[in-house]
Amino acid sequence: DLVRQLRALQPEIAFVALHGPGGEDGTAQELLEILGIPYTGSGVLACQRCMDKVLAKHLFVEAGIPTPEFFAFSQLAFRELGAADALGEIEERLGFPIVIKPSSQGSALGIKFAGSPEDVPGALVSAFAYDTKVLIERHVAGRDLAVGIIERDGEPHVLPIVEAIPLDEPFFDFEARYEIGRTRFVCPADLGNKVAERCAQVALAAYRLLGCRDFARVDLLLAPEGEPTVLEINAIPGLTDTSLLPQAAAAAGIGFDELVATILDNAHQRQDSARR
């Protein structure tokens, strides 16, 4: 099993590139800490905060970081309240359209757009299939932006911003994210200096608030009036050829090998500091 393999290998550094529950929710990180193995990326608490969208949203609100209006239901609370009352609460608090998401999933899994009350039951079924808690969020019409952040010598730096333009859907869902031809990506996004600086400012504030380190991706929606709102933070963003963080790094002149080396260097520096 994994523990036996890790104990046998005793790696100098574990490069964490896992996704979903068990990988980016702090579980793997906690295991590595128990085994005394240094690792890349955010620590246990930051991963837990990022993975739990509802918790992250509450933290954003408390810190004054702009984020779309929302509330959440656990599966138990939804059953106790009843479908009719739950729908009434949604309509009264948020109106329509809304976006319904599992609280703790990545890659846009289980996310559904609900343009009217009739869309809500199916969207809730989809979200509850992935988690026992769902986030219900006011839909913000605007541009989907991904702000990659990478640290060098302990300081986070914002990479060129990526804009995701879905070609046939109202928002950037799982299919639009992963099916070739469903989304066009533009990097750097055509934002203008003032808006780009504001997006970077908001993304860095969210990154620091949740305690991220080494690298992350902050997903924003840019409203028509030019104000960015934070949707979520991915503590372990994808590192494939088509992933957004490597695209952003490439636009900054950072090749994939250099990107990986930089992430590893951060972990090495932490290890060296801990030994002193």
Language-model segments: residues:
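ATP-binding N-terminal substructure of ATP-dependent carboxylate-amine bond-forming enzymes
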Residues: D1-L45, R49-M51, L55, S74-G88, ...
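Active-site nucleotide/adenylate-binding loops and adjacent lid/helix of ATP-dependent enzymes
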Residues: L6-A8, R49-R143
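Short alpha-helical
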Residues: G23, D144, T240
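A glycine- and small-aliphatic-rich helix-loop capping segment at beta-alpha/alpha-beta transitions
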Residues: E30-Y39, S116-P121, A252-G253
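Hydrophobic beta-strand scaffold residues
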Residues: P38-Y39, T67, I98, F256
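Phosphate-binding site of ATP-dependent enzymes
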Residues: K112-Q201, L222-T229
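ATP-dependent carboxylate activation and anion-phosphoryl transfer catalytic cores
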Residues: D190-R276
